[in-house]
Amino acid sequence: MLDIREILDAHNSDIRIIAKIENQEGVDNIDEILEVADGVMVARGDLGIEVPQERIPGIQRTLIRKCILAKKPVIVATQMLHTMINNPRPTRAEVTDIANAIYYRTDALMLSGETAYGKYPVEAVKTMTKIAAQAEKDKLEENDIRIPLDENSNDVTAFLAKQAVKATTKLKIRAIITDSYQGRTARNLAAFRGKYPVLAICYKEKTMRHLALSYGVEAIYMPELANGQEYYFAALRRLLKEGRLHPTDMVGYLSSGKAGTQTSFLEINVVEDALKHAGDSVLPNSNRYL
């Protein structure tokens, strides 16, 4: 993986690396892998061959937790709906398997043989979507994964992301908005597994696609404007127009000073109030670059 990273860096590429964990060696070295990889795929099918099958559920849960703590996307994959390769309906065990991955708070689910060569590819996708959507509604509101903040760390982005998510439990905040150049703030917000969506307004379409894997993140591309303040207000107007927000909604807003720097402030606004005073209000770092 280090060799791949070196090649990508040599070509100034921002292609992401997803590490496939398929054997005991991958499980044993997950901490080191997470330091280098951009995300992880839990390949249960291959793992089931390499390690005792009764260990797979525990390994899956451990890997998901470690990825969340590392703020890296995690995908649960293989044999999610294996029965649907040849049959139009899943087994109850498969339904429960998908739901449990959601309850463990995975970022993404993946089909393989079901859509690659199965007889019911569209039905498999629809079935997984329905099960996942219901599991999202049924999962416990209380998140049992606590992400500690290092007291010796100066990671302002992580600190403000945690405060923003915590604020949604104390105030009637309906969404957290962040303008996103590389997606780091959005991924930090995703790691805290909040109840309300993270609306990442992306300067680059590629960033929007990268964030598609992150938990609870709705990534939206919007071209750059003259400054960050105008960008924020333009985003609010667009979100209102698309029905993603309502005028009376309260939102949190995280942003930074300029590209390549960590998030530097958190604001909480009512949408209509923010837009009403858009012409005369000055946000922190109003001239920031995206």
Where are these regions (language model features)?
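Non-catalytic helical/linker scaffolds that mediate oligomerization, partner binding
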Residues: 1-290
